[in-house]
From Swiss-Prot:
Keyword Chaperone: no
Family matches, as InterPro entries: Dof, Znf_Dof
PANTHER family to which the protein is assigned, alphabetical: DOF ZINC FINGER PROTEIN DOF1.4-RELATED (PTHR31992), DOF ZINC FINGER PROTEIN DOF1.7 (PTHR31992:SF232)
Cystine pairs: none
Zinc finger (Dof-type): 33-87
UniProt keyword Calcium present: no
Name assigned to this protein: Dof zinc finger protein DOF1.7
Annotated spans, Disordered: 74-125
Ranges of Low complexity composition bias in the record: 88-99
GO molecular function: DNA-binding transcription factor activity; transcription cis-regulatory region binding; zinc ion binding
């Protein structure tokens, strides 16, 4: 009986080895090819391009460039050509949108004095500022510190210290009370009486 189990184990092990050998693709032995650019024999095989056996990729250690056997030679600079952005001293069009624009226009009262109109682009229609009742288009840019200085009174909403509602978590209309007994329908941006 013991001979039968050992024979079965041997048969199973030999079948597993045969199956493992069949699953591994036999890769051809890679020879040292000459570089098509500089004809240097100092090359090495890297990998198969996209795991395709018909497109082996090679690297020339002399000119430090890659090529695919049978592929077109591309004029790629040494080092692969980087896409790093250069540090530019000039301003780009996108940075001009972030800067303040100042337009001078004459006074209509005829006094000859000129006033400057300042506006910060991107702040005119800020939905977060509208949601919390902060001034929209404020050139001074009311900040979070100015909100704290106002004792958390956001556009007439008063934060109750006993509730667990925090600004920014949700609307929390059950734990927020208006000082003048009206509430704001934020979706329609209109005032209604209770």
């Amino acid at each position: 009986m013991q001979d039968l189990t050992s024979a079965a184990a041997y048969y199973h092990q030999s079948m597993m080895m045969t199956t493992a050998k069949q699953n591994q693709p036999e890769l051809p032995e890679q020879e040292q090819l000459k570089c098509p650019r500089c004809d240097s024999p100092n090359t090495k095989f890297c990998y198969y391009n996209n795991y395709n056996l018909s497109q082996p990729r090679h690297f020339c250690k002399n000119c430090r460039r890659y090529w695919t056997k049978g592929g077109a030679l591309r004029n790629i600079p040494v080092g692969g050509g980087t896409r790093k952005s250069n540090k530019r001293s000039g301003s780009s069009p996108s940075s001009n949108l972030k800067n303040q624009t100042v337009a001078e226009k004459p006074d209509h009262h005829g006094s000859g004095s000129e006033e400057k109109e300042e506006r910060v682009s991107g702040q005119e229609m800020n939905p977060t500022r509208m949601l919390y009742g902060l001034p929209v288009g404020d050139p001074n840019g009311a900040s979070f510190s100015s909100l704290l200085a106002s004792n958390m009174q956001m556009g007439g909403l008063v934060y109750e210290s006993g509730s667990r509602w925090l600004p920014g978590m949700d609307l929390g209309l059950g734990s927020v009370r208006r000082s003048d007994d009206t509430w704001t329908d934020l979706a329609m941006n209109r005032m209604e009486k209770n």
